[in-house]
Amino acid sequence: MVNSNMLKKKIDDSGMKIKYVAVQIGLTPAGFYKKINNESEFKVSEVVAITRVLGLSSNERDEIFFGSGVA
């Protein structure tokens, strides 16, 4: 499961919109929202793309996508 709150905060902090990030990683906004809300899982390639687009560190990436305290 994804730490949705942390991912949304990182997107907001970046100054980008969720719809923009969705397009940058090759998803529709609706598909991206489903994944953010844990209705569907992110593919590894999508995690890599989000990490690149948002400029996440490996620790941030791991906390968002692989941490035990996901929300």
PLM regions and their residue ranges:
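Short, charged recognition helix plus adjacent turn
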Residues: K10, S14-G15, V23, K34, ...
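Residues within the helices of the helix-turn-helix
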Residues: K8, K19, A30, V48
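DNA major-groove recognition helix of helix-turn-helix/homeodomain DNA-binding modules
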Residues: S45-E60
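Short acidic alpha-helix initiation/capping motifs at coil-to-helix transition points
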Residues: M1, S40-V44
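Residues that mark the N-terminal boundary/hinge immediately upstream of a DNA-recognition element
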Residues: K17, K43-E46
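A short, Lys/Arg-rich alpha-helix, primarily the initiator
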Residues: M1-K17
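Recognition helix of helix-turn-helix/homeodomain-like DNA-binding domains
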Residues: L27-E41
